Amino acid sequence: MDDKQPLTLAVGRIVRPHGVRGELVVEVRTDSPELRFAPGSVLGMRRRGAHASENFTVAAARPHAGRLLVRAEGVEGREAAEELRGALLTVTADELESTDDPDEFHDHQLEGLRVVFPAGEEAGVVAEVVHTPAGELLAVRTPDDREVLVPFVSEMVPEIDLEAGRIVVDPPEGLFDAEE
């Protein structure tokens, strides 16, 4: 018997309740929110500190201030919504659409990759891909355990080699310098 769990990927995080009817403010972590958060969509939900996932069925979703307001089936009222604060909303990796674009990546493909400067010296490891309204950032954990946020744009990230497990970054001067 195979006990291996499928790889799950976060497509959103519940930030907080909104209003008194149980709506949830969701920070989106997917390029396809209209697909992932369509009414009737069933996502996995892992509450803070929990190891097991439970089902989260979207009843409705609408954009709000760079995030989504989501109503979930079975979540009625602010108290029920408050219990979900901080939960991750997930899909399994096999639910993701493959892309034919060589410059398009899923977060899980980048997280854990070695980060090097153009001359080859180590810069760190990609700890997380951070999604913001202004664009994506690579959170790079440096060898001295600092976190540096690198804008995920071709000028600063000129090369990604998934097979070699490596990303080349060419940041502006001072970005990786330790604070004095």
Curated annotation (Swiss-Prot):
Which Pfam families does this one have?
PRC_RimM, RimM
* The keyword Cytoplasm belongs to this UniProt entry's keyword annotation: yes
**Membrane-traversing stretches:** none
Give the record's GO biological process terms. Answer: ribosomal small subunit biogenesis; rRNA processing
PRC barrel domain segment(s): 102-175
An MF annotation (GO) of this entry: ribosome binding
Q: Does the keyword Cell cycle apply?
A: no
Q: Which InterPro entries match?
A: PRC_barrel-like_sf, PRC_RimM, RimM, RimM_N, RimM_N_sf, Transl_B-barrel_sf
- Indicate the principal place this protein occupies in or around the cell: cytoplasm
Which UniProt keyword terms apply here? Chaperone, Cytoplasm, Ribosome biogenesis, rRNA processing
**Domain description:** The PRC barrel domain binds ribosomal protein uS19.
Instruction: Tell me its family.
Output: Belongs to the RimM family.
> What HAMAP family would the database entry show?
Ribosome_mat_RimM (MF_00014)
What is the role of this chain?
Answer: An accessory protein needed during the final step in the assembly of 30S ribosomal subunit, possibly for assembly of the head region. Essential for efficient processing of 16S rRNA. May be needed both before and after RbfA during the maturation of 16S rRNA. It has affinity for free ribosomal 30S subunits but not for 70S ribosomes.
Task: Describe the protein's quaternary organization and the partners it interacts with.
Answer: Binds ribosomal protein uS19.
Q: What is this protein called?
A: Ribosome maturation factor RimM
The gene for this chain is rimM
